[in-house]
Amino acid sequence: MKPKLMYQELKVPVEEPAGELPLNEIEAWKAAEKKARWVLLVLILAVVGFGALMTQLFLWEYGDLHLFGPNQRPAPCYDPCEAVLVESIPEGLEFPNATTSNPSTSQAWLGLLAGAHSSLDIASFYWTLTNNDTHTQEPSAQQGEEVLQQLQALAPRGVKVRIAVSKPNGPLADLQSLLQSGAQVRMVDMQKLTHGVLHTKFWVVDQTHFYLGSANMDWRSLTQVKELGVVMYNCSCLARDLTKIFEAYWFLGQAGSSIPSTWPRSFDTRYNQETPMEICLNGTPALAYLASAPPPLCPSGRTPDLKALLNVVDSARSFIYIAVMNYLPTMEFSHPRRFWPAIDDGLRRAAYERGVKVRLLISCWGHSDPSMRSFLLSLAALHDNHTHSDIQVKLFVVPTDESQARIPYARVNHNKYMVTERASYIGTSNWSGSYFTETAGTSLLVTQNGHGGLRSQLEAVFLRDWESPYSHDLDTSANSVGNACRLL
């Protein structure tokens, strides 16, 4: 039962009329209000602008922090990166009419060593920089021996030297001498880890400059084998990212190590095929990233080498020029034999479906796998005016005299690169399945428009070699070559 309540009507207080302000005071009040609004707007814009500036500065300073999702583009690199192609041209190999000339590999290496201040990291396959290593007495070994001497001088002058090398089954004298000089060396047992080898070839100096290319730590790679690589100067953004690949090798070089099921985040990268690094390269805007093989050695964000290579092939619309020592659409070292057409299919599709001009310059020497010839002939057979498929294959043979023929494992074109109208790919692997699925390798990919950049320089090198007298059609007589080419 509700209690009986007494309600009393409340009286709303009546507002007394306010006195009206004089007209001049009203105008003054409106002007002051307008001014206050403008001041507030300026303050808000200043705060927002300052916040944006500090955010940008933070990203520049702490670019390696994990601040981006998988599809967010990282901040550009503002280093004045300079790329220089470097080559080893074997003694006796001349291009008299060529307009393309690049610094030598030994010149570039010695320059990097002379300029090293704090650190040098080297990822390598094997070490034979002296005549003693190869049981030879060749004057041309002098360049390799000088490189070794300069390497030995680094640690005593305060440079931290780290060397990751494939677990060797050959000479150790160079590595032992470097250990004695104060360098650190770790041997990576890729055979145990992935049934492959550490085939990578790169240097990182002061986390600012780097070399990446086909040259091994071998005196023959400086004077008796044709090599190609790139030196990147003043490009700490890319150099630090390459150091992450080295750190993976360094980690795996520890005793009892194994490949992590998930790599620690410190190995991750933000730069890959989907989000390449924006850089200024030789004064021109470019996109770049580093890829790695095999896939188990690719932490989060790292594009596998094969995926990167195939993306270059699939993106080409005009031409694809390839220079590589070995080309085999097989798992070269597998037993039983396995067909592996990943790259082969991409090249055939590019030529047939998109009308892309494909050129392959394959090396031929005394150690070439004879089975390559059948696969190369199969590719070349697609050259047809009716289908408008334009694939051509040539063999590059380094001329050899009697004394040079006595140098073991020399006198070969060891290049491993590709160039299209859009991109350049410089790697460390031969083009067969095992190199991408089991063996450790690294590649640099750069997309750059215009002339004078890395891409156009690489194209010029390819055309120089393609049009040289050292390049031969597959139907060339073996007798006319005068070398131990096993593919003719």
Swiss-Prot record:
Disruption phenotype: Deficient mice show normal brain morphology. PDL3 and PLD4 double-deficient mice develop spontaneous lethal hemophagocytic lymphohistiocytosis with substantial liver pathology and die at 2 to 3 weeks of age. This phenotype is rescued by expression of a single allele of either PDL3 or PLD4 or via administration of TLR9 or TLR7 blocking antibodies.
Entry remark concerning the domains of this protein: The catalytic domain contains two conserved PLD phosphodiesterase HxK(x4)D(E) motifs that accomodate the phosphate group of the nucleic acid substrates, with one nucleophile histidine residue forming a phosphohistidine intermediate and the other histidine protonating the leaving 5'-OH ssDNA/RNA fragment, resulting in the cleavage of the phosphodiester bond. The homodimer has two independent catalytic domains arranged at the dimer interface.
GO biological process: inflammatory response; innate immune response; lipid metabolic process; myotube differentiation; regulation of cytokine production involved in inflammatory response
Protein task: 5'->3' exonuclease that hydrolyzes the phosphodiester bond of single-stranded DNA (ssDNA) and RNA molecules to form nucleoside 3'-monophosphates and 5'-end 5'-hydroxy deoxyribonucleotide/ribonucleotide fragments. Partially redundant with PLD4, can cleave all four nucleotides displaying higher efficiency for ssDNA and RNA fragments initiated with uridine and guanosine residues and lower efficiency for cytidine-initiated substrates.
Tissues expressing the protein: Expressed at higher level in brain than in non-nervous tissue. Expressed in mature neurons of the forebrain and appears to be turned on at late stages of neurogenesis. Expressed during late neuronal development in the forebrain. Expressed in the pyramidal neurons of the cortex and hippocampus. Low expression in the cerebellum.
Name of this protein: 5'-3' exonuclease PLD3
Keyword Oxidoreductase: no
